[in-house]
Amino acid sequence: MNGAMSLPFLRLYLLVLLYFSANAILNVIIPLQGGALGANNTTIGLIMGAYLFTTMFFRPWAGQIIQKHGPIKVLRIILIMNGFALILYTVTGLGGYLVARMLQGVSTAFFSMALQIGIIDALPEKDRSQGISLYSLFSYIPGMVGPLVALGMWQGGMNYFAFGMIAIALVTGVVGYTAKMDKPQTQPSAENTDHHVNMFHSFGQLVKNPHLFKSSVLMLVGSIVFGAITVFIPLYAEQMENGNAGIYLMLMAATVVISRFTLRKRIPSDGKWHPKFMMGTMLLLALGAQCVSYSIIGGVVFFYVGAVLLGVAQAILYPTLTTYLSFVLPPLNRNVLLGLFIAMADLGVSLGGIVMGPIADIFSYSTMYQICAILAMVMILFSMERRKILVR
């Protein structure tokens, strides 16, 4: 494979687009369906959070299993599980949604790790940031049209929803089973390490390794904000005059896609920590959350400006931290440690629904988003680097 934009990689990005298209629809359908059935914010947050909360637990093992068996073998098995989860949505209610979200969470843990590890291993160092950025970009393209498609399904009847989930499951499976990846030229031998010792040692690295710790905390807090936005915007928009959740989510996703494509070459790919770059990213996150909070008073202009600011922040944060860690983590257990880092992103999105849901029940959506803005402001200070971090 030559470069992140070569034909084999474009095929992988197409698979990413198809896989995550279901979630772009589910992120709108589940809160609306839950609200229609009388579920409160806590229940809706629990169901939505179960997806990535489950993913979080399986990420580290996913990285280890993929390192042992290779991404393609794992990918093909996972696509079957994902198809079953999507079909389960079509024949159950809220209780079944919880089970389906958990199955989908397991699938996503292995799917995303398989694709990202395959991309990182196959690309030269100078192209890594572009590869990760394009992976992230294609995972967000469905968000440009998914929310509007979901609203159309909601208004037209759940039969359209059932047909859509089945179609996505089938097409994703076909594309996934024909995908190919180059094997990495060098890779640590699985036989040379004790997997169980490695795993528990790796959990300790989450705190002991300063690179992993700093990146994980930033990703955790950023993901809490993104999770709160994803879960509760469909319900928050209903309280706002002229507010439209479909337009908001589409605008935010479009911003992510455009930003990731236009800024992909500006994302650092040198293995160094760039404090000013990260502080600016967290400032965008804080301003975006504050705009969403204030929009209940200030109007829809602040609502949609918040979508743009949060979209830019989301476009930058994940690929920047992932690329940085791909350089500074020890090669022997890099895949497992990357799995732990991505698990922090999963945990954050889950907490955005599970923890912020009760806060919205007790206070209001506006107050909940105000708290998100405060958390992001704290992370601006956390992004400051007291000592120079270089690749060892």
Q: What are these language model-derived features?
A:
Residues 95-104, 301-309:
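Paired small-residue
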Residues 1-6, 182-216:
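Juxtamembrane intracellular "pre-TM" segments in multi-pass secondary transporters
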Residues 73-87, 276-290:
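Structural signature of the two symmetry-related core transmembrane helices
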Residues 102-139:
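Cytoplasmic helix-loop-helix junction between adjacent transmembrane helices
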Residues 3-47, 52, 211-218, 223-236, ...:
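Helix-loop boundary and gating motifs at the non-cytosolic
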Residues 161-178, 369-385:
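Symmetry-related core transmembrane helices of the 12-TM Major Facilitator Superfamily/SLC fold
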Residues 58-70, 259-273:
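Helix-to-loop junctions at the C-terminal end of transmembrane segments
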Residues 49-62, 250-262:
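Central cavity-lining transmembrane alpha-helices of secondary-active solute carriers
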